[in-house]
Amino acid sequence: MKYLERLTPSCWRIKPGFVPNMKVEGRFYVNKALEALMLEELQQFASARGVGGFLPAVKQIANVASLPGIVGASVGLPDVHSGYGFAIGNMAAFDMDDPEAIVSPGGVGFDINCGVRLLRTNLTLEDVEPVKEQLAQSLFDHIPVGVGSKGVIPMNAKDLEEALEMGMDWSLREGYAWAEDKEHCEEYGRMLQADASKVSARAKKRGLPQLGTLGAGNHYAEIQVVEEIYDKEAAAKMGINKKNQICVMIHSGSRGLGHQVATDALVAMEKAMKRDGIEVNDRQLACARIHSEEGQNYLKAMAAAANYAWVNRSTMTFLCRQAFAKQFNTTPEELDMHVIYDVSHNIAKTERHMVNGTERTLLVHRKGSTRAFPPHHPLIPVDYQLIGQPVLIGGTMGTCSYVLTGTDTGFRDTFGSTCHGAGRALSRAKSRRTLDYQQVLDKLDKKGIAIRVASPKLVMEEAPESYKDVTAVVDTCHAAGISKKVVKLRPIAVIKG
């Protein structure tokens, strides 16, 4: 433990030397329970060599700290768990002016722009409870779900090219989004550096039939009810003004298209690393210099995949609005079904941050980590200037979700980043071995949660028991001051792939 040091009750430091070539320190945020999970994983690794195919999260955070061009610290957020290359819940920023600085697809993840969108309504629990089952069924019928699910939005190859370049502007033009939806979306739902020509034919082939589909795994659409309001002023700015108000949360990403973009880039970058003599501690950290051809190609393709994911969430928003309007025999406008915000938690972005007292342009990798900008930041919508950027934290099936806001402390300490959800505690394989799907469904039923699942066998992987406690994760971020609690939401109906 000589390389690990507790800095504050909720933050640990990983000192350089823990792994070779560390350029900056590592830091991770945990409370008592989460700390035990992190250190147990490390001890298991030390005694048994290996946790599945991944290194333990503490080691992964340290390996990222050894990548060329990194500044500040390699940061692990409270929901951190081991992933491909970077841990999921790891944030790292690289100096764009350093010719050696790199971009790594493992620092973004395979599901590019996997993210969360929250819609509010003017309905209350009393309105929805009697028709909960019908509403869940209606959502399930409207939104295509599951592993190979096909979209219902008519699309040809030309439409896909445009959607990849235009993001939510495409949804707006095609009539699937409201003008103000864009305002309440990170990047306004469109990354301008997207270049569809950098997305391979295979990725496009995978993406074409899947637009407007939910996908499987931890993706879901949830009908939620406001259970607690911690910050009345901030909640009011978001249009949340009472307990028992109904909201809808959509969690989805770029489906097979984003996965293929990441896979293609990793192949190209392995070659670039040999050519440029880039050495890394773990071959899963394949990367390329930001300004190399491979680095730029990846960033342009990643932006296109991110746009695809925003179009995807917009399409599902459209289908959600349809389902609600049909059930309540009115219009989505009458139901006040506005987007509160839409955040990404798997993405790399160019941002300005202070490093050692000077402002620098950085490429911030957030993998399983959410942007959380403070009040008055120029990149957040006018409506939220006084309270800070809304941050949406999805729980797991049957547990609570949270809305937080960004803070100045977070902007300084974690480059404006916070957690993204609960974070796995059990691997998918272990969840399947130890949990029984009927029990998982019965438990949800007892909590009064209506559930519709396309692939019941996947339920165990996503059972609350497979995850860390989302409340512990959010409370740790709140205690560390890197984001602030605003609202707690509880699910009453879940639609899953």
From Swiss-Prot:
Active site residues per record: 420 (gmp-histidine intermediate)
Q: Name one GO cellular component term.
A: nucleus
Name the residues that bind GMP.
218-222, 345-346, 394-397, 401, 420-423, 496
Q: Which PROSITE patterns match?
A: UPF0027 (PS01288)
Query: Which residues does the record give as Mn(2+) 2 binding sites?
Result: 114, 251, 345
A Pfam family reported for this protein in Swiss-Prot or TrEMBL: RtcB
Kindly list the GO molecular function terms attached to this UniProt entry: GTP binding; metal ion binding; RNA ligase (GTP) activity
- Please cite one Gene Ontology biological process associated with this protein: tRNA splicing, via endonucleolytic cleavage and ligation
Q: How does it assemble?
A: Catalytic component of the tRNA-splicing ligase complex.
Describe the family membership recorded for this protein in Swiss-Prot or TrEMBL. Belongs to the RtcB family.
What's the protein name?
Answer: RNA-splicing ligase RtcB homolog
The organism named in the record is Monosiga brevicollis
